[in-house]
Amino acid sequence: MPKVPVYNMEGAQVGEIELKDEIFGAPVNKAVLYEVSLMYLANQRRGTHDTKTRGEVSGGGRKPWRQKGTGRARHGSIRSPLWRKGGIVFGPHPRDYSYSVPKKVRRAALKSALSDKVNENNLIVVDSLTFAAPKTKEMIRVLNNLKVNGKTLIVTAGYDEIVEKSARNIPGVSVMTAPSLNALSLLNHDKLIMTRDAVLKVEEVF
């Protein structure tokens, strides 16, 4: 079982925690990470793109000139795809891009991402994150104490409004609950900060 140090909010080590091998010590499967990340990104797409066909472009109801006798090519509408401002052939139309992969695969990707954070020493466990009131300045102080910079994901056991509000104005810092943790969020951040309770919650849920 991998062991990682546990820090307090002042950045001092106050102990160690043993992590479950099957979650934090799993082999890193890049193929699964790619497949699941692609799914999450596809599911975020709105799919509202649209183009007008020749039947949807305004105008073009009248034949531009008579069929024969002018010496010009024959045309039936000024909204033909051949014309400037004409309709679009086989253009994009609104569609749903979302799809799903099996839960077992999603969990394998999450375990791979968590294990990668441990392998790269990018997982920081804190005994707790408690603030008297929402203060961005206090959260910045804690991050500085932990020597954390760059894109950082903070994971709490459950929803914590004070932690959420304290971190939301810091660029590159996000807050999630342990049950909603996913592989894409982990891959999108360089550092992972988890409370001790969040680690236990992840081991319980996943």
Swiss-Prot record:
For this protein, the record's SUPFAM superfamilies field holds: Ribosomal protein L4
GO terms, biological process:
translation
What GO molecular functions are on record for this protein? Answer: rRNA binding; structural constituent of ribosome
Q: Please tell me one Gene Ontology term that the record gives under cellular component.
A: ribosome
- Composition bias, Basic residues: 63-77
The record's listing under Pfam families reads:
Ribosomal_L4 (PF00573)
Q: Which UniProt keywords apply?
A: Ribonucleoprotein, Ribosomal protein, RNA-binding, rRNA-binding
Q: Which InterPro entries match?
A: Ribosomal_uL4, Ribosomal_uL4-like, Ribosomal_uL4_dom_sf
Keyword rRNA-binding attached: yes
Q: Which domain of life is it from?
A: Bacteria
Span list, region Disordered: 47-77
Decide whether keyword Aminoacyl-tRNA synthetase is in the record: no
Question: Family assignment?
Answer: Belongs to the universal ribosomal protein uL4 family.
Task: List the HAMAP family hit by this protein, alphabetically.
Answer: Ribosomal_uL4_B
**PANTHER family in the record:** 50S RIBOSOMAL PROTEIN L4 (PTHR10746), LARGE RIBOSOMAL SUBUNIT PROTEIN UL4M (PTHR10746:SF6)
Function text: One of the primary rRNA binding proteins, this protein initially binds near the 5'-end of the 23S rRNA. It is important during the early stages of 50S assembly. It makes multiple contacts with different domains of the 23S rRNA in the assembled 50S subunit and ribosome. Forms part of the polypeptide exit tunnel.
Q: How does it assemble?
A: Part of the 50S ribosomal subunit.
Specify the protein name: Large ribosomal subunit protein uL4
Which organism is this protein's natural source?
Carboxydothermus hydrogenoformans (strain ATCC BAA-161 / DSM 6008 / Z-2901)
Q: Which gene produces this protein?
A: rplD
